[in-house]
């Protein structure tokens, strides 16, 4: 199955959701290339770069999207499949 490169931006409005967000990211550690957090007073931003199959990426973003108090946006690069 083809692997794709992409990124996800996670906006955490409810800091109580942070442990659940971290658990989801840990479960998908095998596709995560880079993770960077930007803590602010009222919210937190997390940027993640990943490489995985569309199924793996869908699992990651789907699980994140079901967490209350966060917003998730993802993007995949077109035509940059990896072996």
Protein language model regions, located:
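Long, contiguous binding/interaction regions
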Residues: 1-83
């Amino acid at each position: 199955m083809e692997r794709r490169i992409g990124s996800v931006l996670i906006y955490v409005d409810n800091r109580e959701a942070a442990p659940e967000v971290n658990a989801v990211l840990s479960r998908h550690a095998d596709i995560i290339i880079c993770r960077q957090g930007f803590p602010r007073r009222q919210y937190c931003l997390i940027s993640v770069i990943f490489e995985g199959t569309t199924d793996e990426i869908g699992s990651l973003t789907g699980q994140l999207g079901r967490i209350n108090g966060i917003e998730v946006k993802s993007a995949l690069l077109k035509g940059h499949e990896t072996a």
